[in-house]
Amino acid sequence: MFLNKFWPNNTFKQILIIYIPWRLALFLALFFAVNFIPLAGKNFLGGGIGNYTANPYLFAWANFDGEHYLSIAQFGYKDLEQAFFPIYPAIIHLLSFPWQHSFISVTLIGLLISNISFFLALYFLFKLLRFDYSVRISYLVLLIILAFPTAFYFASVYNEALFFLLAILTFYFARKKRWFWVGIFGMVAAATRVFGIILFLALLIEAWQGRVKIGSYFWILLIPLGLIAYMIYQWVSVADPLAFYHLQTIVGPQHESGIILLPQVYFRYIKILLTSGLSNPIYSIMVLEFVVGLSFFILPIIGFLKKVRLSYLAFALIGFLLPSVQGSFSSAPRYVLILFPSFLVLGIIVDGLPKLFKIGYFIMSGILLIFFSMLFFRGYWVA
């Protein structure tokens, strides 16, 4: 009885109807990638070249950053891994405790966490959007997220899905005025990714606009504690509370330690795209980065004109700008996945298009999703 009240069957089924085909499509992409696309090389493969070669259908989901999360989950932090926040690998570690010596088991636990988190995120995002928007718009936003060219990261051994869930739960309980849970989920989110600190600013705006009682702000103040706790750990372990930031120039050498103005970043990309040939193997990635970098700056601005909630827009705009001012959009196609307000604005725009254009959008986005997921599965850098 309680579960029926908390989890309406119709909503569950509606999301399941779109989630299962999405997972099947990604598995088919993996199948064709393994059989028809050569490996990019021997590095950055999930589990290392030996494990990947023996079981590519499992370890392809743990390429690039996935290797680090699995290593932290099994062995704790090693040199140069402080850029990866602790909550996701900690949960993998706890749930895989009886089987930690099995790399396959740890990987399966990581995938289970990501996929369950993403499904729950879709469910609560639908409920969150229904506070202000129709069923049609809410459902359309979910479809747009699922079809996004880098949405495969939600199903991989990455912390995107977990953070996405935590961020949505934070906003959801803010709209329900359950501020204790806002503080708890926001605090955990801030220890999951550095983007969690943006929730603090966004929720202050939400509380101010809602004219909540002064005592509710106490719970919002819990949010930064997640990041502060990780900074204290880094201070004790490596004598650098900002190691997660300083290591960005090592794990992502395309990033710079200073602040680069956004127009400079756009100019760099325009110059690269005009001077690089179409035969360049990373040209398609550069185009994706530039389009995402431009779109996700414009979408919050359009959202303001569409009267989207200010707290949502703050989360979307600051969440885009925070990594972009390091001088590159190199990981932007993945970073923007958690910026649900931008997808909301995109959903509003797509909803206003003629039917033929809507179909065209989803066909194009779906093709790009399959294309980039296949590249990722075979060890090519995507985001």
Walk through the language-model features, giving the residues of each.
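Membrane-lumen/periplasm interface segments of specific transmembrane helices
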Residues: 25-41, 60-61, 200-209, 213-299, ...
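Short hydrophobic/aromatic helix or loop-helix immediately within or flanking a transmembrane segment
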Residues: 60-101, 265-268
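Loop-to-helix entry region of an early transmembrane alpha helix in multi-pass inner-membrane enzymes
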Residues: 82, 86, 90, 100-120, ...
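Transmembrane-helix signature of polytopic, membrane-embedded enzymes
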Residues: 104-109, 125-147, 308-314
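Transmembrane-helix motifs of polytopic, lipid-linked glycan transferases
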Residues: 109-132, 295-302
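Multi-pass, polyprenyl lipid-linked donor-dependent membrane glycosyltransferases
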Residues: 113-117, 132-174, 181, 188-199, ...
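Signature aromatic-anchored transmembrane alpha helix within multi-pass, membrane-resident enzymes
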Residues: 220-224, 352-381
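Transmembrane alpha-helix segments characteristic
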Residues: 304-325, 335
